[in-house]
């Protein structure tokens, strides 16, 4: 309980005090740098997956045709 009280008092001080401007500016700069980084990480994974699927599609089509040919020979 004392920990929560200390946290509330310290956050209230940072909101009111003039010295806290540098603290909040640093937090804002860090957040503004992290948000695009996280967004790019998720978007690049989906692009890579699409590229991989496009690269292997012709190979899979040839494999399917070969498997169908072998199955027709067995029947």
Swiss-Prot record:
Signal peptide span: 1-22
Location(s) in or outside the cell: Secreted; Target cell membrane
Keywords linked to the UniProt accession: Antimicrobial, Cleavage on pair of basic residues, Membrane, Secreted, Signal, Target cell membrane, Target membrane
Prodomain positions: 51-75
Keyword flag ATP-binding: no
Tissue expression pattern: Expressed by the venom gland.
Main localization, broad class: secreted
Gene Ontology CC, one term: other organism cell membrane
Role noted for this protein: Amphipathic peptide with probable antimicrobial activity. May act by disrupting the integrity of the bacterial cell membrane.
Family listed: Belongs to the non-disulfide-bridged peptide (NDBP) superfamily. Medium-length antimicrobial peptide (group 3) family.
Protein name: OcyC3
Originating organism: Opisthacanthus cayaporum (South American scorpion)
Organism classification: Eukaryota, Metazoa, Ecdysozoa, Arthropoda, Chelicerata
């Amino acid at each position: 309980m004392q920990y929560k009280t200390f946290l509330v008092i310290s956050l209230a001080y940072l909101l009111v005090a003039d010295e806290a401007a540098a603290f909040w500016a640093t937090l804002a700069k860090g957040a503004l740098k992290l948000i695009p980084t996280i967004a790019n990480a998720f978007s690049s994974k989906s692009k890579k997956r699409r590229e991989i699927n496009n690269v292997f599609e012709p190979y899979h089509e040839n494999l399917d045709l070969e498997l169908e040919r072998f199955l027709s020979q067995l029947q």
